[in-house]
Amino acid sequence: MSTDTSKPARLPVTVEKPTPYTFDLGLLLANDPNPVNVPKTTDTQVLEQHLASVARDGAQVLINQLLTTTTITATKDGVLLTLPPPTTPLPREKPVPQPKPETKWQAFARRRGIKPKTREQRRNLQYNPTTGQWERKWGYKGANKRGETDPIIEVSAAKEAMRPEGTSVRGDKRREIRARVKKNQKQMLRNQRIAAEKMGKK
């Protein structure tokens, strides 16, 4: 009884081409400038084998280039190759975005040395020592709305005498909020117009 112990032939490690390959190792790219001579046959298996051979040659020369030109480091996790920076410029679909002009607040904060609030400072929570619990600073059941729903509200007789007819102390807060929102929207539109004018001058 005989057994077939033949092994597939080892493919060559070196690849010779009329025109040398060019490389961009930073992108793991090997460019083959040589034309691909596709065999004139309708047998798809022959075509696939030929294209696989061309692809194999490209992969082999890329591996050879990596092993001979890059820095190789042995670590406990294995062998590491340090790739150089890419050299192939990649085209952009869109133009490079222009830097946004400073808003009025950003310019003011830069002049005064005001730093952005930290994440802790932006938290919408504060400790209420009276109740011993954490509560929201604003929003639903926020501390800034404390007293608005109390059944009895302390008022000043002098201020009540000067109050416009048809208004009540309970509506003051809502009117203040609406006026502040309207003012902020007006200021935002003004800042957007100024920013657009600055962008148009560049």
UniProtKB/Swiss-Prot annotation:
Which UniProt keywords are listed?
Nucleus, Ribosome biogenesis
Would you tell me the Gene Ontology cellular component terms? nucleus
Q: Please name the InterPro entries in this protein's record.
A: Ribosom_reg
Residues covered by region (Disordered): 82-103
Repeat keyword on record: no
Q: Does the keyword GTP-binding apply?
A: no
One of its Pfam families is RRS1
The residue ranges crossing the membrane are: none
Which compartments is it annotated to reside in?
Nucleus
Q: Which GO terms describe its biological process?
A: ribosome biogenesis
Q: Which residues form the signal peptide?
A: none
Family affiliation: Belongs to the RRS1 family.
Query: What does this protein's UniProt record list under function?
Result: Involved in ribosomal large subunit assembly.
Q: How does it assemble?
A: Component of a hexameric 5S RNP precursor complex, composed of 5S RNA, RRS1, RPF2, RPL5, RPL11 and SYO1; this complex acts as a precursor for ribosome assembly.
This chain's protein is named: Ribosome biogenesis regulatory protein homolog
UniProt organism field: Chaetomium thermophilum (strain DSM 1495 / CBS 144.50 / IMI 039719) (Thermochaetoides thermophila)
Organism lineage reads as: Eukaryota, Fungi, Dikarya, Ascomycota, Pezizomycotina
